[in-house]
């Protein structure tokens, strides 16, 4: 009788090894099912924060123009230095396209720059006050996943057409009233490159990428537009993400006639195209 009670206690008083293995297996299966959904939810949350960052930057961009006789802010950070000779480049010299134009962010990427240097470059830019002095608006929450991104304090760039440079002969705009169809014209974009120098470039005269298309958020990118709204674009060509990853920092022009992603990005960046 005592032996039977002991057996019952061993059987029902705790889990057997087999029962524990079954429970662990069930938990593993549930985790395998739930983790992709949790990751997607986490990414959607970060995407929403990024979209809001771009929207706030876009509104700051509009407010700046309102306060400056409709002149849009200088979007070129590559040669800005400390905004003045001798460290600034030719674009900032008399006769240059950005003479006496403070950029939205001072040059914030160069060899030897410290974290404080990069933060001060943002604070010294023309939009910092219009952004409510909020440093978080300048960086996508997903930054840090890619190599080198954790060293960046800014992950957004201005497209070349919006007072950066007339790349590939494209029309560069300086007045907000000169923008035709503001809801379709991009201003800020996530920068997929290894560094955020200058603006974001794409070819004007041919259907080709110049800077890599951003692919931080799944297989798509967040953009802001000249009317102040922001939106997410999902790339249609399955090769877009692969091209971006394979060509990071190489600025390699590969003409792709008929590529809908390139054409759409070119239209947003430049407006009316020559082709």
For each feature predicted by the language model, list its residue ranges:
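N-terminal single-pass transmembrane signal-anchor helix
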Residues: 11-42
């Amino acid at each position: 009788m005592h032996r039977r009670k002991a057996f019952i206690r061993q059987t029902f008083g705790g889990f057997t090894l087999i029962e524990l293995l079954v429970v662990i297996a069930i938990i593993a299966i549930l985790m395998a099912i739930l983790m992709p959904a949790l990751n997607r939810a986490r990414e959607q949350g970060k995407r929403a924060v990024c979209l809001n960052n771009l929207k706030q930057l876009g509104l700051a961009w509009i407010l700046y123009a309102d306060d400056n006789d409709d002149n849009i802010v200088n979007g070129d950070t590559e040669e800005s230095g400390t905004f003045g000779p001798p460290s600034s480049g030719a674009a900032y010299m008399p006769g240059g396209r950005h003479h006496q134009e403070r950029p939205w962010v001072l040059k914030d990427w160069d060899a030897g720059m410290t974290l404080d240097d990069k933060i001060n470059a943002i604070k010294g830019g023309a939009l910092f006050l219009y952004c409510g002095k909020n440093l978080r608006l300048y960086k996508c929450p997903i930054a840090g996943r890619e190599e080198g991104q954790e060293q960046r304090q800014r992950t957004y760039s201005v497209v070349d057409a919006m007072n950066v440079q007339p790349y590939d002969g494209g029309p560069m705009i300086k007045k907000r009233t000169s923008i035709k169809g503001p809801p379709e014209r991009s201003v800020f974009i996530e920068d997929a490159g290894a560094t955020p120098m200058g603006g974001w470039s794409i070819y004007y005269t041919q259907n080709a990428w110049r800077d890599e298309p951003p692919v931080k958020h799944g297989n798509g990118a967040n953009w802001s537009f000249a009317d102040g709204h922001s939106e997410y674009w999902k790339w249609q060509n399955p090769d877009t993400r692969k091209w971006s990853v394979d060509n990071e920092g190489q600025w390699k022009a590969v003409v792709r006639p008929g590529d809908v992603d390139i054409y759409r990005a070119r239209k947003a960046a430049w407006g009316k195209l020559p082709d």
